Design a protein with these regions (language model features):
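Gly/Ser-rich catalytic/binding loops embedded in alpha/beta enzyme cores
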Residues: 3, 7-193, 293, 298-299, ...
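Acyltransferase
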Residues: 37-42, 71, 283-306, 328-331, ...
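Short glycine/serine-rich loop segments
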Residues: 121-246, 418-419, 423-432, 436-439
Length: 478
């Protein structure tokens, strides 16, 4: 994968080249015999060991278990050849898993010093990745219990952006996005309750997809019905490959049994609503202002619109806080991040009537966006209206009190689509004058996941940005 207009991953790093390319490139390594799976996975584990201390993307690494799985993959390839990839489409592909998602062989700490028991079984998404042949190389960092949209916690410290280590990777799936961007895995699985896949994807210059609600089972289910499991990868094609493996019902998640239907047939010319949120920086606008013309050039009709989004505190924070209220015993509060503890305490103060009012606001927002989507096939906008801020912070300095969930003040474009359950994808739109990635978000109607992916692939090819933070080609190994 040739990189254009890119910057070094780390000044003085011993790893100058990203070890993992795309899923397609990784398959080609094995199919052409340029690398065995075992050699490639060994290179990945070495790169994590040598490079990750500078990023902080991983909180646990698989080690010998991953190498045993790699040896088994090599035996399968030697035995049946190319047919192995038809049976197991992700065979040998190194992936990572966010530390909120259960894995049977690696601890799930949830970014917290609080005690956690190792899961007895993989979450559905992890089990499906393994069944497709993917090799889990480690667990990636998150803010404590995913509470904030940056990835800083007392367990592992800050996760840094591979494009600029003094900047945040975003969150709460910041470790997943940073690991993919740095070439330490080909793909990762994150969670998204208010933008936690899309925000770090935008900041780190990778593709992140929050599918329609319950398209991928979430186990154990979340009471607030906001959380989605979603993939992060180097390209839209990689995300589509992952979705083919990850989707489908699971009886442990009742919502997944009634998940969305396949996408409707798309008209040749789509109606697209273009939104710009207040507070969009000049740097972000400078990257995204050309997107409406790109969409028009693809034959679509683009109209600049405004949508009256609901108050995020009433629509989101009260419900999240109520769900968190009993999540931490008072005697364990000294182990918690202050920001998450503020959420827990606020949740304890809420009355049942306040939570019902919050649900009414959510219903109003769903109705508002349903009416908008009667007029438009998709919406498009900058994923995040600002550039990545300081890596050690949980919010930019002007967001007065991060403990009050003020990521909603600097990232207003993501949370509404968790409330509505609509599919929303962030793909790289380009780089600012400081060389920092900017994301473009595409949003479809509930169930129109395939339509979002198809348009994203076209836009990706038109923008022609290879968003890999290195001035070189991805490398395999023998």
């Amino acid at each position: 994968m040739t990189c254009s207009g890119a910057v070094p991953v780390f000044t003085g790093s011993s790893i100058r080249q990203p070890v993992c390319g795309s899923i397609h490139e990784t398959r080609q390594l094995f199919l052409t015999g340029r690398s065995t799976v075992a050699a490639h996975v060994r290179n990945v584990l070495d790169a994590i060991r040598d490079t990750d201390p500078e990023i902080g993307a991983f909180v646990a690494v698989a080690g010998d278990g991953a190498l045993r799985e790699a040896d088994a993959a090599d035996r399968m390839i030697r035995t049946v050849g190319e047919a192995a990839f038809r049976e197991r489409p992700l065979l040998g592909v190194p992936v990572s898993v966010k530390d909120l998602i259960q894995t049977r062989d690696l601890p799930t700490r949830r970014g917290s010093l609080l005690p956690n028991r190792r899961a007895a079984a993989d979450a559905p998404a992890v089990a499906r990745l393994r069944a497709a042949g993917a090799i889990v190389v480690g667990k990636t960092t998150t803010s404590e219990y995913g509470w904030s949209a940056s990835t800083v916690n007392r367990l592992a410290g800050p996760t840094r952006n591979p494009w600029a280590p003094d900047r945040t990777a975003g969150g709460s799936s910041g470790g997943s996005a940073a690991a993919v961007a740095a070439g330490l895995c080909a793909a990762s699985i994150g969670t998204d309750g208010a933008g936690s896949v899309r925000i770090p994807a935008a900041f780190c210059g990778v593709v992140g997809f929050k599918p329609s609600f319950a398209r991928i089972p979430y186990v154990p289910p979340c009471a607030d019905r906001l959380a989605h499991v979603g993939p992060l990868a180097r390209s839209v094609a990689d995300v589509a490959d992952l979705m083919a493996v990850l989707t489908g019902p699971d009886q442990r998640d009742p919502d997944s049994s009634t998940g969305p239907l396949a996408s409707r047939a798309a008209p040749a010319s789509l109606r697209i609503g273009w939104l710009e949120f207040p507070g969009t920086s000049d740097e972000v606008r400078g990257v995204t202002e050309a997107v409406p013309s790109v969409l028009t050039g693809l034959g679509h009709r683009v109209e600049r619109i405004e949508v009256p989004f609901a108050d995020p505190y009433a629509a989101l924070v009260d419900v999240v806080a109520a769900a968190e209220a009993d999540g931490t015993a008072p005697e364990d509060e000294h182990l918690c991040d202050e920001g998450r503890l503020a959420v827990v305490r606020y949740g304890r103060s809420l009355t049942g009537a306040a939570v019902i009012r919050a649900e009414e606001v959510r219903m109003t927002l769903r109705a508002t966006l349903a009416a908008v989507m009667e007029r438009y096939d998709l919406l498009a906008m900058a994923t995040v209206p600002i550039e990545p801020f300081d890596a050690d912070a949980v919010a930019p300095p002007w967001a007065a009190d991060p403990a009050d969930l003020l990521w909603l003040a600097w990232s207003p474009a993501t949370y509404p689509f968790n409330i509505t359950g609509q599919p929303a994808l962030s793909l790289p739109a380009g780089l600012t004058s400081r060389g920092l990635p900017v994301g473009l978000q595409l949003v479809g109607r509930p169930g129109d996941d395939d339509l979002v992916l198809r348009l994203a692939a076209r836009v990706e090819s038109e923008l022609a940005h290879t968003m890999l933070p290195s001035g070189c080609e991805s490398q395999g190994g023998r």
